[in-house]
């Protein structure tokens, strides 16, 4: 959509203006003025677009056409900036005088064209009376329907019985913290239906009650007035002083209030000034529903949260059946053919466990013949039909996102349905596309700001959490099928993303492509074989089994490509030839190679000076030339497996570019680097390094790391692979920020308490000799939550996890993972004091014959 392109333009103009100021100084003040004008004008246009979208949704074709013009303008401006920035950098590198260069004159001419187009858009807006918009009538109708539903006698719940019983007990518990229950979850899960049934069941146990729909654009005065009328405040008291009289009454009454669909915390800040706290001696209760977990957390605390989940398949079919037959128990599947029943099950399954989708679909089917042919037609068109019925409810959550977060959400459209996506990938692709920028004066890194956006998407229940890291951060996530459909539709509508199927046979659409994903090798080969013009392409995702993928790509100059992701899914190792034309992708910022890929990046990579992330999967064997260090913006170099790190790119020969060519403030991840290329001055130089892996650690490296002052200070993750027994004592006690430590050694190594960082949360030991001395040290680590021991040798057959006389043993440990132990036959913990927080014991790999004490047996199931 237009606002997404405008956001990208604004962010890129900020970057270019900063580069001009730093690199060229007063010499280019006139050029910086043009960039600043672009930035200001795009901000104003974006504000107008955000308001105008409501009128577009209402069906105003004039606004729709105007927004299309604005979108095309924003796209052309982005193309201009992407083409212009590399020329600034090249000109600066070779000390050309920009003012006299031809491209600077060309840029000035393009700016004048843009100014004329802006004036023309404003003329059209005024000429055809396309004025600023009022509230969208459709939204008002939707809000009114929700208010009616809130008071309707609809209390049938399917698949939520356990949730209902749990919440009922919680509400009637006298010790309920804050007196608040927060029902949260993604749109369509039945939060309001469940809350209504709870409210109606318990309200007779209170002196007064009220239920209010809050909405996305609430007015505190109207909400308080609604509550006052329902709890019995007299008209006179309302007219005298609504707030004071309402608060006074609620202080002495035992009440229950349901606040449905709260979108943000600001409205609660207004309401709580009047509504007294529920945890008073009176014993009042508050039920809230929200799409945003952070809202519930803010109002009632963490303990108030109750997150609804999609229905299981049988419960989905049960609800589907009830809605098909209008809850008439006398009419069921008894007279239906087995084929029709199976089609019905498939239709219910396509709804993804979302009650709203099931209800909408059943409503469509009730208006059709109950035949296999009619239902099959619905099944075949499920994606569109269900989406149409749920679109407004789901789209409200999207429209509520901050403008800057919307392209981040749409990025999920590039992935297949139900695909687990690493947070690291999303964060760095967002940064590569300039969706995330650090404003001047903000000391936080772009990665931190991007992580905030991801956390917000999860809190709003638009994205589902898949895995967390050792320290509670999001490790991976996925998007629900129904929301994925919405995401894809929105992305295609705005020309944000397409598949090859969408644009085949239409050269005009192909030429406008900005992001494309291939899931099929045949489609990919046919598409590239059609010789498409891909001059505007920014992002290319290829999920493929074809080793010749790079040969297909060699026919094109992806001069504006920012992001390239190649996922090779075949089971065998495939050698790929990456041609030298790979170096023509001079705008490339993010490169990810995943799967069984074997090959070498060409020396022309030296031209990819804007690369920020290189991510090589553990299954890939990719050699990097030394030219990679010419990418002075490089932030993350990730070899997921240390076996790949024996790589020529790490040479520090003075004849080739090397790691010292990098800007010292940029590099954050270096995983792995061979120790023979590791020097003391390197660590002192890389001041923002957060993740470091060293292969073949030497005594000199141990000595460097064990100094009293941490180098670097920002280090959070450290992985060390030893090939020999170090004579130097490891001392990492001066690294307070390290929370994850991985040690791999083939020989015996003595470690005392000073070997470990004071705040370590996750520790992995590989091929260690584990004895009682080492175990005694591990037991005392105060913040250790996860301990993983892989292929370790045990010089004692029995590993006793209990503490000494004082019982002090693994005070924070939650997960103990033992993989393929050697020489271990028994693991015991004979008291209830040791490991008080242990939740799980994992025995994996070859571990036959290991006996466990009773407590550990329960935790290993």
Curated annotation (Swiss-Prot):
Residues engaged in binding ATP: 185-192
Taxonomic superkingdom: Eukaryota
Compartment annotation: Cell membrane
A GO MF label: ATP binding
Membrane association type: Peripheral membrane protein
InterPro entries (alphabetical): AAA+_ATPase (IPR003593), Apaf_helical (IPR042197), Disease_R_plants (IPR044974), LRR_dom_sf (IPR032675), LRR_R13L4/SHOC2-like (IPR055414), NB-ARC (IPR002182), P-loop_NTPase (IPR027417), RX-like_CC (IPR038005)
Keywords: ATP-binding, Cell membrane, Coiled coil, Leucine-rich repeat, Membrane, Nucleotide-binding, Plant defense, Repeat
Cellular compartments per GO CC: plasma membrane
Keyword Membrane set for record: yes
Ranges for the LRR repeats: 225-248, 305-327, 388-411, 449-472, 510-536, 585-608, 609-631, 652-680, 689-713, 735-758, 781-804, 810-835
Main location per the UniProt record: membrane
SMART domains: AAA (SM00382)
Residue stretches in coiled coil: 63-83
GO-annotated biological processes: defense response to other organism
Ranges of residues in domain NB-ARC: 162-388
Note: The Tm-2, Tm-2(2) and Tm-2nv alleles present in the tomato mosaic virus (ToMV/TMV)-resistant tomato cv. Craigella isolates GCR236 (AC Q71BH0), cv. Craigella GCR267 (AC Q71BG9) and cv. Yukang 2 (AC Q5MLE9), respectively confers resistance to ToMV but not the tm-2 allele present in the ToMV-susceptible tomato cv. Craigella isolate GCR26 (AC Q71BH1).
Family: Belongs to the disease resistance NB-LRR family.
Subunit annotation: (Microbial infection) Fails to interact with the tobamovirus mouvement protein of tobacco mosaic virus (TMV).
Protein name: ToMV susceptible protein tm-2
């Amino acid at each position: 959509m237009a606002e997404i392109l405008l956001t990208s333009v604004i962010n890129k103009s900020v970057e270019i203006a900063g580069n001009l100021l730093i690199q060229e100084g007063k010499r280019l003040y006139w050029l910086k003025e043009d960039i600043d004008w672009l930035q200001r004008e795009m901000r104003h246009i974006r504000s107008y677009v955000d308001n105008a979208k409501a009128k577009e949704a209402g069906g105003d074709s004039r606004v729709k056409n105007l927004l299309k013009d604005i979108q095309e303008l924003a796209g052309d401006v982005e193309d201009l900036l992407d083409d212009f920035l590399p020329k600034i950098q090249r000109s600066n590198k070779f000390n050309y005088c920009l003012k006299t260069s031809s491209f600077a004159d060309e840029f000035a001419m393009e700016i004048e064209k843009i100014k004329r187009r802006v004036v023309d858009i404003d003329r059209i807006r005024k000429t055809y009376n396309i004025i600023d918009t009022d509230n969208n009538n459709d939204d008002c109708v939707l809000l009114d329907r929700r208010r009616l539903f809130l008071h309707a006698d609809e209390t049938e719940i399917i698949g939520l019985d356990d949730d209902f019983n749990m919440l009922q007990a919680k509400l009637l518990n006298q010790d309920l913290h804050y007196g608040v229950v927060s029902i949260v979850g993604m749109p369509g899960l039945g939060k309001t239906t469940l809350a209504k049934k709870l409210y109606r069941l318990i309200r007779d146990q209170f002196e007064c009650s009220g239920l209010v729909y809050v909405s996305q654009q609430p007015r505190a005065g109207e909400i308080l007035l609604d509550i006052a009328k329902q709890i019995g405040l007299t008209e006179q008291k309302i007219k005298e002083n609504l707030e004071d009289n309402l608060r006074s009454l609620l202080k002495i009454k035992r009440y229950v209030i349901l606040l449905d669909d709260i979108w943000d915390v600001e409205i609660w800040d207004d309401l709580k000034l009047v509504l007294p706290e529920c945890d008073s001696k009176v014993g009042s209760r508050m039920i809230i529903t929200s799409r945003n977990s952070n809202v519930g957390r803010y109002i009632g605390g963490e303990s108030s949260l109750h997150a609804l989940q999609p229905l299981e398949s049988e419960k989905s079919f049960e609800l589907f059946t009830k809605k098909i037959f209008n809850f008439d128990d006398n009419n069921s599947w008894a007279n239906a053919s087995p084929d029709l029943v199976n089609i019905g099950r498939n239709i219910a399954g396509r709804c993804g466990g979302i009650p709203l989708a099931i209800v909408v679909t059943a409503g469509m089917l009730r208006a059709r013949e109950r035949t296999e042919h009619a239902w099959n037609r619905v099944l075949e068109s499920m994606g569109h039909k269900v989406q149409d019925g749920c679109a407004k409810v789901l789209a409200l959550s999207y429209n509520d996102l901050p403008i800057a977060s919307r392209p981040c959400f749409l990025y999920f459209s590039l992935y297949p349905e139900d695909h687990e996506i690493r947070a690291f990938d999303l964060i760095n692709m967002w940064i590569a596309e300039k969706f995330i920028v650090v404003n001047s004066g903000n000391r936080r890194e772009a990665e931190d700001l991007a992580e905030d956006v991801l956390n917000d998407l999860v809190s709003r229940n638009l994205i589902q959490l898949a895995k967390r890291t050792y320290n509670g951060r999001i490790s991976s996530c996925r998007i629900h099928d129904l929301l994925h459909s919405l995401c894809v539709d929105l992305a295609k509508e705005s020309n944000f993303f397409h598949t090859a199927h969408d644009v085949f046979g239409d050269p005009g659409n192909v030429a406008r492509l900005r992001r494309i994903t291939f899931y099929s090798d045949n489609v990919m080969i046919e598409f590239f074989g059609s010789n498409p013009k891909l001059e505007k392409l920014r992002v290319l995702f290829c999920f493929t089994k074809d080793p010749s993928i790079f040969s297909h790509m060699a026919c094109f100059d992806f001069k504006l490509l920012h992001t390239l992701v190649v996922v090779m899914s075949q089971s065998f190792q495939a050698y790929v030839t990456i041609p030298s034309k790979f170096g023509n992708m001079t705008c490339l910022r993010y490169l990810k190679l995943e799967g069984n890929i074997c090959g070498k990046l060409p020396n022309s990579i030296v031209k990819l000076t804007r690369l920020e992330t290189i991510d090589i999967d553990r299954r890939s064997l990719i050699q990097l030339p030394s030219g990679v260090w010419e990418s002075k913006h490089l932030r993350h170099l990730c070899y997921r497996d240390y076996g790949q790190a024996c790589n020529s790119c790490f040479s520090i020969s003075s004849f080739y570019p090397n790691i010292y060519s990098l800007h010292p403030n940029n590099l954050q991840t270096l995983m792995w680097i061979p120790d023979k290329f590791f020097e003391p001055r390197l660590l002192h130089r890389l001041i923002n390094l957060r993740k470091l892996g060293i292969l073949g650690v030497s005594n000199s490296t141990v000595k460097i790391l064990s100094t009293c002052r941490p180098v670097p200070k920002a280090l959070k993750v450290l992985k060390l692979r030893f090939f020999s027994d170090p004579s130097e004592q490891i001392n990492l006690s001066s690294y307070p920020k390290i929370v994850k430590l991985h040690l791999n050694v083939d020989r015996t190594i003595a470690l005392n308490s000073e070997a470990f960082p004071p705040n370590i949360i996750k520790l992995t030991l590989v091929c260690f000799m584990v004895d009682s001395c080492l175990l005694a040290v591990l037991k005392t680590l105060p913040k250790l939550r996860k301990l993983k021991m892989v292929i370790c040798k045990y010089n004692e057959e029995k590993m006793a996890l209990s503490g000494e006389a004082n019982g002090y043993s693994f005070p924070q440990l939650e997960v103990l993972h033992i993989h393929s132990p050697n020489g271990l036959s028994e693991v015991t913990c004979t008291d209830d004091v040791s490991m008080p927080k242990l939740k799980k014991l994992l025995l994996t790999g070859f571990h036959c014959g290991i006996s466990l004490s009773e407590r550990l047996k329960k935790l290993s199931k």
